[in-house]
Each structure stands twice: as C-alpha cells, then as structure tokens.
Design a protein with these regions (language model features):
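Electropositive polyanion-binding surfaces
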Residues: 1-2
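Beta-propeller blade signature
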Residues: 16-17
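Gly/Ser/Thr/Pro-enriched helix-cap/hinge segments flanking short amphipathic alpha-helices
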Residues: 6, 12, 23-158
C-alpha cells in the first residue's frame, strides 16, 4: 500500500490486492484520493492486520481495509511501563530456536497517524513459541511455551 503521492497532482493511492501472485487494483479505487497516512492494526481483533487510509480532504471518506484473507496463527505482545512499552524490543522464536520475528514496540505510523503500542507477529502454522522481551530500561525476560492466537501482556495482566 502506498498511502499518498502528492496532494497537488491528484494522485491516487496505490492499493493492490494479491490474487494468486497477480496484483490488482481493487474495485472503487479509481478516483483520486490523498491519504496522509495508512496505519496498520488488528482493528477487529481477529489476528490479521487491517489498514486504515486517512483521507486528507474532509469531503472524501477515510477507508478501512479489513484483512479477510485466510489466517494462520498469530501473537500480539504489549508491555506495561510508564510509556506503554514504546521502545521495548520483542523477539519470537520457534521451539527449535529459529527466530520467527523481531519488532520494536512503537506508536507512530507515518504522517499524522498512530497505532496501538503492540508488537504483532504472523506465525503461520507455528502453535507454540518462546518470547524474549527487552524493555527500554534494558531488562530482558524470556517467556517459554507461549500459546498463540492471543494478546500476551507483560508483566502478566498489564
């Protein structure tokens, strides 16, 4: 997704849909828009990331693109501290030690946009993982045998 080109030239945002390896423009997006941002978050809490196109022009609508693709396993991680975990690093490992993903928790997403302070991981077929969290203060914690398809809050219950 390219959220914007230029407000002055009437550029249309580029949104392509992957259909079996061929990318296509979805229906209804042939008119010029100027999306100043396109934050990504799991809006409907189904484990798949959705995109929200923020329209610049007040007379034109912003648009939520719900991800309705077949989903695999997933994990979301948040950290409770005075700044909502922003700056904490999260790594997720398979049981064999393979790194599945690494994220830094942040709350910014482009111009004039924000997102939840959550690290999101798509895990495919993996159903149990280990999570390593390193806080801004430098504290590192490892949590083994984490079940997936959940929002893990650390410390527990944050």
């Amino acid at each position: 997704v390219v959220a914007s080109g230029s407000v002055r030239d009437g550029s249309a945002p580029i949104v392509l849909v992957n259909r079996e390896g061929a990318f296509e423009l979805p229906e209804g997006l042939g008119t010029p828009h100027y999306w100043v941002g396109a934050p990504v978050a799991d809006v409907d809490l189904d484990g798949r990331l959705d995109v929200f196109g923020l329209e610049w022009e007040p007379s034109l609508p912003s648009r939520l693109f719900r991800n309705v693709t077949p989903g695999g396993h997933w994990l979301q991680v948040s950290v409770a501290d005075p700044v909502g975990g922003v700056g904490s690093a999260v790594e997720v490992f398979a049981n064999d030690g393979a790194l599945l993903g690494s994220r830094e928790i942040g709350a910014a997403s482009g111009y004039s946009s924000g997102k939840p302070a959550v690290a999101h991981f798509g895990l495919g077929d993996v159903d149990v993982v280990s999570v390593v969290i390193t806080t801004r203060a430098g504290e590192t914690v490892t949590i083994d045998d984490v079940q997936v398809d959940v929002h893990l809050r650390w410390p527990d219950g944050c």
